[in-house]
Amino acid sequence: MHMRGINFVLGLGVALGLLAGCQAASPATKQASSQSSKTSAKSVHSSAKHQSQARPYQHWHTVKDVHLPILMYHSISSGNQLRVPAKEFKTEMTYLKTHGYRTLTANEAVYALKHRRIPQKKIVWITLDDSYKDNMTAAWPILKQTHQHATINFITGFTHKKNHLTLADAKRMQASGNIDFQSHTVRHLDLNNLTYQVQLTELSSSKKWLDHNLQQNTQVICYPAGRANQQTIKADKQAGYQYALSTAPGIATSTQNPYNLTRQRVVPGMSLTAFQTLLTSNN
C-alpha cells in the first residue's frame, strides 16, 4: 500500500478509538456520575426538609376567630378532684386520637391565637399543672402511646421536692417531642397576694430558668390556682410572656384577653359525653 494510504488508515483507526473511548464511560466515571446524582437528590430532599422546618405553619389556614379548648389536668393519679386516674386519662387521650383531634404544642397554641390560623378544625391544647412526677411516670407513656402532645406548667423551685419533676426529667421528656414546658412560677404562690416586685421576680426568674435550662423562649405563664390581678398582667408583659392561663372555665378564643385565657377543667369520674362537651361547649 502507498505510504499516504497507510497513514490515512492509521489516522482513521486512532480517531475511531478515541470516539469509542468517549462514548463508553469507564466504571469510575459511571460511579462518579451515580454519586453526583445521589448527592443532588439528597440536596433537594434536605432543602425541602429545611424549608418545611423553617415554615412550620405554611399549611395552616386563616379563620375569623380561633376556638381552642385548653384542657386542664394536674396529677395523673387518684385521691381528690384535682387528680385524674391514669385509666381515665388514657380513655380521654384515646378519644382525642380516634376522633381526629390535633393536640397543639404551646408554641403552636400561641401562634394560632395570635395569628388566627389553625392546622385543622379539631384542635385542643392539653395542659398539666404543677409538674408532678406522675406526669412522667403515668401521663407521658399514655401520650406517647396515643401520639398526643401536652404542656407541663413547671414550678421551677420544686425540682428537688418529692413527687415533682427534676430538671433531668424535664430535659428527657422535652427531647421526646411529646412534651413541652411553660412557667408556673418559682414557688407556686398566689400572685394576687404579692407586691408587684415580688410578682415580677416570680415570673421573671421562672422564665429565665426555663429559657436557660431547656434552651427555649418560654411564652406562657400559668397562674398558680388561677389567682392574678392587674399588677400581675403588667408583670407578665415586663417579664416577656405572650399569654397567660387562668382557671376560669370556657373555651379560649383569639378575641380573649391574652393574659387571662380560660381553660376546661377535667375532673375524675367524668363521662366521655361530659369530656366531649369540654371540647365543644362553654357550658
Where are these regions (language model features)?
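Sec-dependent N-terminal signal peptides of Gram-positive bacterial secreted proteins and lipoproteins
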Residues: 1-31, 35-36, 40
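Glycine-enriched alpha-helix->loop->beta-strand junction motifs that scaffold or abut catalytic
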Residues: 15, 146-148, 177-179, 237-243
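N-terminal structural segment of carbohydrate-active enzymes
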Residues: 63-104
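Metal-dependent polysaccharide deacetylase catalytic core of the NodB/CE4 family, i.e.
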Residues: 66, 71-79, 122-124, 132-136, ...
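C-terminal domain-boundary segment and adjacent tail
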Residues: 87-116, 211, 237-256, 263-269
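Low-complexity, Gly/Ser/Thr/Pro-rich intrinsically disordered linker/tail segments
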Residues: 267-283
